[in-house]
Regions:
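A structural motif
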Residues: 50-51, 102, 160, 182
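Glycine-rich phosphate/ribose-binding loops and adjacent secondary-structure elements
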Residues: 151-210
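An N-cap/entry alpha-helix motif that binds or orients negatively charged groups
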Residues: 1-16, 126-147
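Glycine-rich beta-to-alpha transition loops that act as phosphate-gripper elements at the mouths
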Residues: 36, 57, 83-84, 146, ...
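Short, small-residue-enriched loops and turns at beta-alpha junctions
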Residues: 31-33, 85, 113-115, 141-142, ...
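Short, ordered loop/turn segments at secondary-structure junctions
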Residues: 58-59, 110-112, 168, 190-192
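N-terminal capping/small domains of soluble enzymes
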Residues: 1-99, 105
Length: 210
């Protein structure tokens, strides 16, 4: 108590990228399900903030269009991807992102298979059949069930961008990711929707810090 808090500064940096405050946008698929402008509307809404937006590989807008929309803003763009069973999908996505000016690659690690999410089965949206992924063919790609920490090293070999691994909840996994070449990790349990029985994210943060 009794500390001078009259001049609070929330600015920080992540992997050398300055941000106004330590809050960014996690990857969310198919923004056009929520609004016709999709990811472009999201960029417009946060373009005045100097923060990080992670674009989902299952975005409903071309990543090149998102990059153009963000180029005159203070927004830092990172591209999320998976290790797909056909590595060509991953390679192409990463290289397109790098060519478009993205500043980081986020690898989702907690999806070796596509989970059955019961709430998604129960819920239906009027436009879900009309909104498709723009950067990959959602009907052809599959997650790789054989992906390992070695794939972080492989991913690092095909890009100069920093690799951020998302979906780790233990200190042991965090250490393995860093040893494999990851520049950072994102502690995440995928909103509790991917792996049944996952601990809460704040528990994973504690283990990872240790």
């Amino acid at each position: 108590m009794l500390r001078d808090v009259s001049k609070n500064i929330l600015e920080t940096s992540t992997l050398g990228q300055k941000v106004d405050f330590p809050i960014g946008l996690s990857p969310v698929a198919l923004h056009k399900l929520a609004h016709p402008e999709g990811e472009l509307g999201t960029v417009a809404g946060i373009s005045s903030f100097r923060t990080i937006m992670i674009l989902s590989s299952f975005a409903s807008t071309l990543l090149e269009e998102v990059a153009v929309a963000a180029q005159n803003s203070s927004l830092h763009l990172w591209m999320q991807t998976y290790i797909f069973d056909n590595r060509t999908w991953t390679t192409t996505l990463v290289r397109r992102a790098e060519m478009s000016g993205f500043k980081g690659i986020v690898l989702t690690a907690d999806s070796p298979i596509d989970a059955t999410v019961t709430c998604n089965v129960r819920m239906s949206l009027e436009n879900e059949d009309q909104v498709l992924t723009a950067n990959i063919d959602q009907h052809k790609v599959k997650f790789s069930a054989s992906a390992t920490f070695k794939d972080i090293s492989w991913l690092k070999s095909i890009t100069k961008l920093p690799i951020i691994v998302k979906g780790l909840l233990s200190g042991e996994d965090a250490k393995l990711a860093i040893l494999a070449g990851a520049s950072a990790i994102l502690v995440s349990n995928h909103g509790g929707r991917q792996m049944d029985g996952d601990p809460a994210t704040h528990s994973g943060e504690k283990f990872s810090r240790e």
